[in-house]
Amino acid sequence: MSVAPETTVALQDRFFRELPELAVRWQAETFPELRLLVLNEPLATQLGLDTGWLRGPDGLRFLTGNLVPTGAAPVAQAYSGHQFGGFVPRLGDGRALLLGELVDNKGRLRDIHLKGSGATPFARGGDGLAAVGPMLREYVVSEAMHALGVPTTRSLAVVGTGRPVYREATLPGAVLARVASSHLRVGSFQYAAATGNRDLLRRLADHAIARHHPGAADAEQPYLALFEAVVAAQASLIAQWMLIGFVHGVMNTDNMTISGETIDYGPCAFMEAYDPDTVFSSIDFWGRYAYGNQPVIAGWNLARFAETLLPLFSENTEEAIALAERSFGVFQTRYDAVWATGMRAKLGLPAQVDAEFAAALIDELLALLKANHVDYTSFFRQLGRAARGDDRSAAEPAREMFMDLPGFDAWLARWRALGPDADAMDRVNPIYIPRNHLVEEALAAATDGDLDPLDQLLAAVTAPYTERPGFERYASPAPEDFGKYQTFCGT
């Protein structure tokens, strides 16, 4: 490791200075042969980073932690977590480092974080490395989520390391440079609470308020206001996942952010045929994190968050619990509002349509989609075509997706009678998402050294609402011979 000139990049070490008990100073491993696989130039510009420098030797060393700016203090962060319902008191960044924070061109403090940078004291016997495929998967999906308007961590770059990674096969290694509003998690609070150090817990809460929810500082009960703000942010986030058919796959408490951003894309995937029981993760044997369970699991995680904050709510435990339970009502209210508003937009419903009528229309449609195994993303885009005409030909692309034509036609007639707005529908219903078969195709090619399929896929999913000639295959569901899809965390 070496130190960069002061004028290159200015990183802060706010997390380490304010919460040293939650951080271990550490250095990235030195890698033999760095090769830039993908660089997010628009994001780099937002961060005030010179893209030409990032592409050069020093920039690549910076993106892998091998060149540290003067004054920076790379750390592995400590946190706990409930993993598939079981509490693990000591998790932490086993193969990641927080390089530091910088201020972007909008004045926001952002984390620069490395994934796959080598083993840390939290590695739990792992090698601390990451393979090209999983790192590029996170790059593709996180940038697609950003383009879809969903709060998410961002991907700045993926750099090949020249070091082999030994998994089920020998794979080329890579480091992902990730950008986030912060990496504070529910698990961060669980770790602080487990220490029994009330001062640490309070400082962590104050840090979270200052960084993410500053309005809570002026509330009569700031820590209760923090809890309510996180509950509201997560309720909104999960509703947005549900609206686009996103399945996170590993909703452990250490993967739930205080900022309300989506984080950690290991076993994630997008649902194709609509089914609330959709599961992709190879280790989610009981469907705990199935698509339809995501709101319930989010609530469960937030209850664990509330438990950590009880000492800050009140010295009286019963009173603290009562306050938490009352505040938790924010979740369902916010979730229902974001979901209902989003579904109305997906259906192009005018504002004057009665809420109860709209809810019944939505429920009936979802039942039809499930019963007919209809591709979720394609359907809503094709339905927009049906809103552009009253004849059967305009509706035919959507009708062709159903076996129960009488059932769908009856629903279609009621929907058309409401005067849906086709242009509004096209603004919220994507035509391109990271289709599972196309992601696998791009990752396999990239692992073999061919980045063209990755570049094409990124071109599609980072402009998801604009239909373009030559991109037809990126709008199509997986072929039947693709089979049942499973994902793996890549650890």
UniProtKB/Swiss-Prot annotation:
Name of protein: Protein nucleotidyltransferase YdiU
Keyword Cell inner membrane: no
EC number: 2.7.7.-, 2.7.7.108
InterPro entries xref list: SelO
Gene that this sequence comes from: ydiU
Required cofactor(s): Mg(2+); Mn(2+)
Keyword Manganese recorded: yes
GO molecular function: AMPylase activity; ATP binding; magnesium ion binding
Binding site for Mg(2+): 255, 264
Reactions accelerated catalytically: L-seryl-[protein] + ATP = 3-O-(5'-adenylyl)-L-seryl-[protein] + diphosphate; L-threonyl-[protein] + ATP = 3-O-(5'-adenylyl)-L-threonyl-[protein] + diphosphate; L-tyrosyl-[protein] + ATP = O-(5'-adenylyl)-L-tyrosyl-[protein] + diphosphate; L-histidyl-[protein] + UTP = N(tele)-(5'-uridylyl)-L-histidyl-[protein] + diphosphate
Keywords, sorted A to Z: ATP-binding, Magnesium, Manganese, Metal-binding, Nucleotide-binding, Nucleotidyltransferase, Transferase
Function (record text): Nucleotidyltransferase involved in the post-translational modification of proteins. It can catalyze the addition of adenosine monophosphate (AMP) or uridine monophosphate (UMP) to a protein, resulting in modifications known as AMPylation and UMPylation.
Active site: 254 (proton acceptor)
Residue positions binding ATP: 92, 94-95, 115, 127-128, 178, 185, 264
Organism the protein comes from: Mycolicibacterium paratuberculosis (strain ATCC BAA-968 / K-10)
EC class name: transferase
Protein family: Belongs to the SELO family.
